Regions:
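N-terminal, Lys/Arg- and Ser/Thr-rich interaction peptides
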Residues: 1-40
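Interfaces that engage single-stranded nucleic acids at replication/repair/recombination sites
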Residues: 2-7, 154-173
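Positively charged, aromatic-enriched nucleic acid-contacting surfaces
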Residues: 39-162
Length: 173
């Protein structure tokens, strides 16, 4: 595989510290979340404005129900323009909870209710779309360093080294 094949990937893979945040709670606690606005920015830097140098189309939306909870899912196709030609569809599927059962907090008394109650997210479709976009963009290399574990969100003191830089530094010693 030539470096030419990896040029786009290498241009998109590094995530600046200010575009990352550590997830503070839930099943993903301690993992890295990448700010969605950064993804839009890096795509615009690489391909041009959305709608001109890149765009996406929602192919399908659907919901799934499990007991009393409902999740929403989005399948979309991402397209990028390279050298005047449009790519084939780059598919991404994402999801988010539309209705979930949660313990409701009584903020006045700083207590949680003992019963679970349904919570409806008015941002679920947007969040599922954002998730699907991140899955599609990941295939181009967007934020690859984070997904490959080459960027440590907790101790991020310097830019992540690429695998090639790490290999080169060990070979030259």
């Amino acid at each position: 595989m030539s470096e030419d094949n990896l040029k786009l990937w290498n241009d998109l893979k590094a995530v600046p510290r200010e575009a990352k945040k550590t997830i503070q709670a839930g099943r993903l606690k301690g993992m890295t979340d990448i700010k969605p606005q950064w993804r839009l920015q890096i795509m615009t830097e690489q391909f041009g404005a959305v709608g001109f140098g890149w765009y996406y189309e929602v192919a399908k939306t659907w919901t799934e129900t499990y007991n009393t909870e409902v999740s929403v899912h989005v399948q979309l196709n991402l397209y990028v323009n390279i050298g005047g030609g449009w790519s084939k569809p780059i598919s991404g599927i994402g999801g988010s909870m539309l209705i979930s059962n949660e313990k409701i907090k009584d903020y006045e008394n700083d207590l949680y209710d003992t019963k679970f109650k349904p919570y409806h997210s008015d941002e679920a479709y947007k969040m599922a779309t954002t998730d699907a976009l991140s899955v599609a963009m990941k295939q181009l290399g967007v934020a690859a360093d984070v997904y490959m574990g080459l960027s440590d969100s907790k101790y991020d003191k310097k830019p992540a080294q690429t695998v090639n830089q790490i290999k080169a530094s060990t070979v030259n010693k």
